[in-house]
Amino acid sequence: MPNAIHALVTESRNPFSTHIDQLSTLDMLAVINQEDQKVPFAIENVLPEIAQAVDAIAETFMKNGRLIYLGAGTSGRLGILDASECPPTFGTPHEQVVGLIAGGQQAILKAVENAEDDRSAGEQDLRNLALNEKDVVVGIAASGRTPYVLAGIEYANHVGCVTVGISCNPDSALAALANIAITPIVGPEVITGSSRMKAGTAQKLILNMLTTGAMIKTGKVFGNLMVDVVATNEKLVERQKNIVMEVTQCDRQQAEQALLQSNGQCKVAIVMLLLNMSAEEAKNCLAQANGFIHQALTLVK
């Protein structure tokens, strides 16, 4: 590895928290809060690289490829969290965004010893998904040196995937391997080496951007409304109705009727009402427009 562990920024001591164990609760939290405020600025510095990754992911989605997150510990759990939120939020198939964690399913709730050091598992987990060149693989490792992640990225490169590396240390092995390196430098953690803190926060914000940006670019959002939301609970049933009413300026009864006729598909209900057509006609119109409402409306006009 190009960086010895002790030399990593994420492993260094934070001079602003050296006496945190002697502070009052309020002062302790003030230190943590002050350090957390550095995270968005670190991300601002890497927005061009995040944009590159978003464009690559959007392109792969349009070709029916997948986004696959690969991480260990906190990094792996964050990938799984982001992946699990995509189907209800954007109506995507569960296999479109996948999160892999070193140590497998059991590692989600409980740390698995030495799992992150298992290079062979990084490659094997991707093989088990039948990885192909249409997929984008995002390796997440605060240190930038996690063997499980590095091996996975090496294999993904071999397959011909676009690879992205998210780390919080400069000049990391992960950044060197990935096609697109996203490296927000958030500085030393409040508790030395606890990368679940600022580094984890930075990773979460970046993953939010990757999936949200790609979903916007593939027609899953109209204005700033999640028009492919799946109504899996009462709150989301109401959200669907509110979205349809907001876009079409119809009343609640019309929204409910359109959603019923469209089998709970917001997009279809919206196009039905705006263009005064049947559910089947609206579906066909959206299919011709690759799922983009703006384009569907233009097609008919």
From Swiss-Prot:
Q: Where is the SIS domain?
A: 57-220
Q: Which SUPFAM superfamilies does its entry note?
A: SIS domain
Q: Does the keyword RNA-binding apply?
A: no
Top-level enzyme category: lyase
Matching entries from InterPro entries are given as:
Etherase_MurQ, Glucokinase_regulatory_CS, MURQ/GCKR, SIS_dom, SIS_dom_sf
- State the similarity comment: Belongs to the GCKR-like family. MurNAc-6-P etherase subfamily.
Matches recorded under PANTHER family: GLUCOKINASE REGULATORY PROTEIN
What is this protein's record name? N-acetylmuramic acid 6-phosphate etherase
Q: Which organism is it from?
A: Pasteurella multocida (strain Pm70)
